[in-house]
Amino acid sequence: MGKVIRSLSRFGKKVGSALTSNAAKKIYSTIGKAAERFAESEIGSAATDGLVQGSVHSILTGESYGESVKQAVLLNVLGSGEEIPDPLSPGEQGMQTKLKELEEEQRNELVRLKYNDKIKEKFGEELEQVYEFMNGAAKEEVGAEKQFDILSKAVNSYNKILTEEDQQMRRLAIALQKEIGERTHVETAMVKEYRNKIDALKSAIEIERDGMQEEAIQEIAGMTADVLEAASEEVPLIGAGMATAVATGRAIEGAYKLKKVINALSGIDLTHLRTPKIEPSVVSTILEYRAKDIPDNALAVSVLSKNRAIQENHKELMHIKDEILPRFKKAMDEEKEICGIEDKTIHPKVMMKFKIPRSQQPQIHIYTAPWDSDDVFFFHCISHHHANESFFIGFDLSIDLVHYEDLTAHWHALGAAQMAVGRTLTEAYKEFLKLAISSTYGTQMHTRRLIRSKTVHPIYLGSLHYDISFADLRGNAQRIVYDDELQMHILRGPLHFQRRAILGALKFGCKILGDRLDVPLFLRNP
């Protein structure tokens, strides 16, 4: 279990404290004579101009001469009209979530209409039965079927889809790691098709990248969702090439409403089983190899990174199938005996036994301090139920404080076995506020408000899903804590923009582009 408390870095911050230090005062007292002698020389008069300009640039930006503000890019590709919401604006988040759900539903239905026969052939007739049950268009024999059997069929169908997706991704990763001469005919075709998609994605990202303003944190935007999904899907399960509707595992699950059926019949919410439309490490690799060909090994790393998220989802579903469903069936039988319920139906009482609080769902949960809420907020990030892990990352932007800590797992109906290790969210939050209160950088009013906030529970502002694996999410959080250069780039602009940048860097990761600029050389007169 880890805990890290650090001061955040911003451009200009180190110079602000350096100008008032004792060492600086000694330098100022001796610099006059040295500068006078130097300026009298011929070389000195030519160099002074560049030196002064370099010094002014350094004082204004807080950089040493070898540093420069670079371009930072969040590693997600937004569809047209999308935007990362402000984490402290629940209304903004809710509106976006609802719009995305409607778009996804429409696109998934297209996949079902286009590939229905092929999907049934590959994954079995059970998918169609589950879909008909959810749509209320069930035939008599399906209507007479027990609800628990429909639930089992939905779980089994989802298991087949995730197994197939996992196998295909591993095949592609293995093919990419082989030498060209050692690949089979099928592997060669698979790699060639994937490379074509990467080239298309690279061209689209390159166009966006060239149009970006320098020295800004930005997202790559503007691709339509259909093109994006087709270009970024490593191995479509049905449909190939750059078709506008490819049957990805995510699309098949959505088209046949498997998660909705599982939720409707058992009360178990599986909306956290997600995979990124485009793997952030793919965007990072494309940006890294702008002017040259991307090696196969680098692509294999990205494929394996996405496969981690798929495997995590698969383990979660197996946990539900092997651990939770037998307990669910037992609870059903007990309730049937007590209440004398019909054998076919699942009583709502049984479902409620497997409901878990919203604040313990595997998502990024957002909280803020009751006072000075714009500056003081934190995220509680929870892993899948089978892993039972979580961490806390808190920010006080007014005094530039960040606090990261691994937390103990919560017990709930869907959780796996756990060890009593680590602290609770409340303990971490109180220590975070205690450290912020003791900081010498805070104003008197800010300190008073923090003391008041410490006596009450934080305000819960809702939650957001994350698409990457929990290990990658934790890696992104730790990079925000440790990487000074990243902090300098995300902590610029208005407060709401900084909060969005922090959330983007946590959910997707962030790539700093460009080489270091030699500022004095750049500013020196020819």
Swiss-Prot record:
Keywords: Capsid protein, Outer capsid protein, Viral penetration into host cytoplasm, Viral penetration via permeabilization of host membrane, Virion, Virus entry into host cell. Its main location: virion. One of its GO terms (biological process) is symbiont entry into host cell via permeabilization of host membrane. Residues 1-42 are annotated as: Involved in membrane permeabilization. It is found in: Virion. InterPro entries: Capsid_VP5_Orbivir. It comes from the Viruses. GO terms for molecular function: structural molecule activity. GO terms for cellular component: viral outer capsid. Belongs to the orbivirus VP5 family. VP5 protein is one of the two proteins (with VP2) which constitute the virus particle outer capsid. Acts as a membrane permeabilization protein that mediates release of viral particles from endosomal compartments into the cytoplasm. Permeabilization activity is probably negatively regulated by VP2 and is triggered by endosomal degradation of VP2 and exposure to low pH. This is Outer capsid protein VP5. It comes from Bluetongue virus 2 (isolate USA) (BTV 2). The lineage of its organism: Viruses, Riboviria, Orthornavirae, Duplornaviricota, Resentoviricetes.
